[in-house]
């Protein structure tokens, strides 16, 4: 599916979702990984640094259950160790559509409740660039899948969540030259961390 078509489908879905009478809430969430396990094809000896935020429209299906349709922006950077002769640096950006559900029916007090969120993330578009001492490459076509879930605590409109997420993203025709051989570049990450959210 072409990138432009993916963007159009995402825009139509979010517009229709947001204009429904039920969709009276939106949520923004920032994710802060605490523990990560990353394997980046083509950068096996380097550490991937990531950041991400999520904006979602919420559709109540019952008093304590909500469906969510949202947008996730993912950004990552990676760099070869100084001992590497290739000297590659990589920048990756991805725009993902999020489909999920949340439950917040476990009330601890009048204003505090436990919640649980789960979602899948489908890449819609992305850009990536790798630069080395001898060559460089760019890509604007992305594929893969992501998963997210975790328990948390909601206090009024604020929430704190302990999350687990897994992400597998590949960029078409993005390669690096290692020991005279071309290697495809792809991101595989598992993260545990803290999420801060606000519903408005």
Predicted features by range, described:
Residues 22-77, 197-199:
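Short glycine/proline- and aromatic-enriched beta-strand/turn motifs that initiate or cap beta-hairpins
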Residues 26-32, 67-71, 99-101, 116-118, ...:
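Membrane-embedded beta-strand positions of outer-membrane beta-barrel proteins
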């Amino acid at each position: 599916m072409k990138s432009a078509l993916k963007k159009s489908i995402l825009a139509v879905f979010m517009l229709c979702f947001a204009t429904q009478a039920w969709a009276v809430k939106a949520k923004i969430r920032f994710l802060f990984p605490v523990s990560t396990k990353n394997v980046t094809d083509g950068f096996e000896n380097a550490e991937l640094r990531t950041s991400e935020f999520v904006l979602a429209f919420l559709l109540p299906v019952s008093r304590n259950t909500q469906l969510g349709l949202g947008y996730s922006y993912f950004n990552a950077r990676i760099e070869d160790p100084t001992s590497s002769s290739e000297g590659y640096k990589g920048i990756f950006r991805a725009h993902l559509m999020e489909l999920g559900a949340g439950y917040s029916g476990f009330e601890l007090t009048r204003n505090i409740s436990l919640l649980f969120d789960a979602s899948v993330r489908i890449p819609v578009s992305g850009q990536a660039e790798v630069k080395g001492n001898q060559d460089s490459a760019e890509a604007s076509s992305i594929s893969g899948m992501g998963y997210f879930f975790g328990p948390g605590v909601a206090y009024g409109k604020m929430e704190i969540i302990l999350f687990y997420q897994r992400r597998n993203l590949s960029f078409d025709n993005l390669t690096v030259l290692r020991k005279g051989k071309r290697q495809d570049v792809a991101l595989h990450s598992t993260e545990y961390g803290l999420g801060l959210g606000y519903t408005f």
